[in-house]
């Protein structure tokens, strides 16, 4: 399908005079995804036109000063997707078919994919053999940046204190090393301790604090964790690693210990099993010296205030006083974690058991656990932390603007910072970069329209998986998706688009959901794929349409890409089922955690086990909008100082930190 170039873009193309051509620098395309910026890389007019023709098919426009990089093309290839690459062309088509017709179509499809061992070209038999392509009318913009500006973005993220996903951390480090900015990085300024440890190992720049040094050594040896765990299993593993090291590796370990023997002696007694596990012929002398120095250098461990503040016993006044004294030293992300933890404690006080989303994204349920809850004290503590969070935001809620007075003198005035939020999406406070779903903090929600809501997944074979399955399980136990119903009505209409088992070149599965449909969980299962695969989750909402009208108006399609209000790439490293959305009281609440199961269809019993605690968690996320207003920001729908409608993950991190 031909792409119509918008008039405003044609004006830029016709007026564009490219600078002197030179080979543009290379920046990993995933950093473009992270920052919505690309390194300055000029091009000729033909390249500018070609790049933006590709960009518009993905819903983007690329500034002429950054069109010359090959990484832009990789970025655009990844971002281009057709949400209408579904089994059936319209939801009406699904509704019109009987159960036997639906089954026959699916069996024909399976025979052409699994039945031929995927030797047939393309997606096999699919009724929607020519998926409709709908042009974008709204575009995100990729802007140019200097090498120094991209470094500041990377370094700012490291200093923010947010817990950073290791893959993101590797991207940041790669850029800082490749563009020779290492000398500008102070490792002690990297606020997140795990990120600090990984950065130190991979760059050779070490921190000064004792526990930070020990974390670095732990990651250096294990290559997968900086956590200081003293369990028998962990110590045994550490000893085996040291025993298996080469002579050069042991000498390097000895060198690091020797250079930091005094500082490590201050924590020797606290982490004695870990340090002794590093003992070998090359390190025995220095470890013995650390042990002797510990006699005079030992610093007793004090349990941190914030680790014990939820259980004050009868010292509530003293705890509140101490909280007020210490709260401003916390990062914004630690404050958000504490506030969310307080709300979970309060909202879950009448429930038995607790649900924890652990580091690998799996869910752990502690049955029968019921922590103490002093509601009055916890609300007071919550207000102390919230007030500090708002004070921090308030420093960014004032914008200075230059104007002229009656005598033509330049004067500087202050006004509230104008901020534009995504329409129809309620953003939550970010607690960790690991707890983002795409560019949105976990718990962010989409407000459902009365009728026209579509949630879907999209993938390609070359993303690591042939066959993903989209499922919806209602609170009543009804199941929609593969091996379940294709359509039905439980207070509101639910329709499934059909099962795709190959994505060559691409595939999508969708669910049509009305607002009055029952509370439900939407899950994604990987039926066939490798460990390092991914899919794109998207939500489209059209409040102006009713009862599938838009399928006729949009060339018989299921999804209008211009109505997509949420999209996120989600990595699926294991074979468990991922719960990606909780539908609760007219909202789609975004999540991303595995159930830990290995069944091909999500277990209804598992859903019931985590249902109660999922509801507690869903009701404990904190709205960003409420705190922005309290801090003094002005919410606008037009021209804004801060526009989060096209936000990158980094934009939100910079706003709150």
Where are these regions (language model features)?
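Intrinsic-disorder/low-complexity signal
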Residues: 2-251, 255-657
């Amino acid at each position: 399908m031909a792409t119509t170039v918008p008039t405003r873009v044609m004006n830029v193309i016709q007026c564009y005079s490219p600078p002197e051509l030179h080979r543009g620098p290379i920046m990993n395309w995933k950093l473009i995804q992270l920052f919505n910026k690309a390194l300055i890389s000029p091009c000729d007019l033909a390249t500018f036109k070609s790049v933006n023709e590709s960009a518009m098919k993905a819903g983007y426009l690329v500034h002429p000063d950054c069109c010359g990089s090959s990484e832009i093309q990789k970025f655009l290839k990844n971002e281009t997707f057709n949400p209408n690459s579904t089994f059936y062309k319209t939801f009406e088509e699904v509704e019109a078919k009987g159960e036997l017709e639906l089954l026959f179509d699916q069996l024909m499809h399976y025979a052409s994919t699994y039945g031929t061992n995927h030797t047939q070209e393309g997606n096999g038999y699919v009724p929607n053999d020519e998926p409709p392509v709908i042009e974008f009318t709204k575009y995100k913009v990729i802007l140019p940046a200097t090498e120094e500006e991209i470094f500041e973005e990377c370094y700012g993220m490291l200093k923010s204190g947010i817990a950073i996903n290791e893959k993101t951390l590797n991207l940041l480090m790669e850029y800082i090393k490749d563009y020779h900015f290492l000398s500008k990085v102070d490792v002690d300024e990297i606020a997140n301790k795990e990120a600090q440890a990984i950065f130190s190992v991979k760059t050779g720049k070490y921190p000064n604090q004792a526990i930070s040094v020990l974390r670095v050594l732990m990651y250096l040896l294990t290559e997968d964790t900086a956590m200081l765990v003293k369990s028998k299993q962990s110590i045994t593993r550490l000893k085996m690693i040291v025993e298996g090291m080469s002579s050069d590796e042991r000498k390097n370990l000895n060198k690091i210990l020797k250079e930091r023997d005094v500082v490590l002696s201050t924590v020797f007694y606290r982490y004695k099993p870990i340090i002794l596990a590093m003992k070998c012929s090359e390190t025995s002398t220095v470890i013995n010296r650390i042990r002797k120095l510990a006699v005079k250098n030992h610093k007793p461990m004090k349990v941190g205030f914030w680790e014990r503040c939820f259980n004050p016993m009868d010292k509530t006044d003293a705890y509140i006083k101490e909280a007020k004294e210490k709260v401003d030293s916390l990062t914004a992300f630690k404050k958000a974690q504490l506030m969310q933890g307080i709300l979970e404690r309060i909202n879950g006080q009448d429930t038995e058991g607790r649900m924890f989303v652990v580091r690998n994204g799996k869910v752990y349920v502690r049955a029968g656990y019921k922590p103490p809850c002093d509601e009055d004290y916890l609300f007071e503590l919550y207000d102390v932390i919230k007030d500090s969070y708002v004070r921090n935001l308030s420093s960014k809620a004032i914008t200075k603007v230059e104007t002229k007075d009656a005598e033509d003198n330049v004067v500087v005035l202050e006004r509230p910072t104008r901020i534009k939020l995504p329409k129809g999406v309620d953003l939550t406070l970010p607690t960790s970069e690991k707890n983002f779903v795409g560019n949105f903090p976990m718990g962010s929600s989409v407000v459902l329209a009365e009728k026209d809501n579509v949630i879907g997944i999209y993938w390609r074979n070359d993303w690591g998986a042939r066959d993903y399955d989209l499922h919806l399980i209602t609170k009543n136990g009804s199941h929609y998706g593969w091996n379940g119903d294709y359509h039905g009505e439980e207070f509101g209409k639910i329709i499934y688009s059909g099962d795709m088992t190959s994505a060559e070149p691409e595939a999508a599965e969708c669910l049509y959901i009305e607002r009055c449909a029952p509370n439900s969980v939407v899950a994604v299962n990987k039926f066939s794929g490798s460990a390092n695969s991914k899919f794109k989750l998207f939500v489209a909402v059209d409040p102006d349409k009713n009862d599938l009208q838009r399928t006729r108006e949009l060339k018989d399609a299921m999804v209008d890409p211009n109505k997509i209000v949420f999209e996120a790439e989600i990595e699926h490293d294991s074979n468990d089922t991922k719960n990606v959305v909780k539908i609760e009281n007219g909202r789609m609440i975004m999540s991303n955690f595995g159930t830990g199961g290995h069944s091909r269809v999500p277990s209804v019993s598992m859903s019931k086990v985590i249902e109660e605690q999922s509801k507690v968690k869903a009701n404990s996320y904190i709205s960003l909008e409420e705190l922005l207003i309290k801090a003094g920001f002005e919410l606008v729908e037009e021209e804004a100082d801060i526009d989060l409608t096209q936000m990158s993950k980094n934009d939100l991190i910079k706003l709150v930190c």
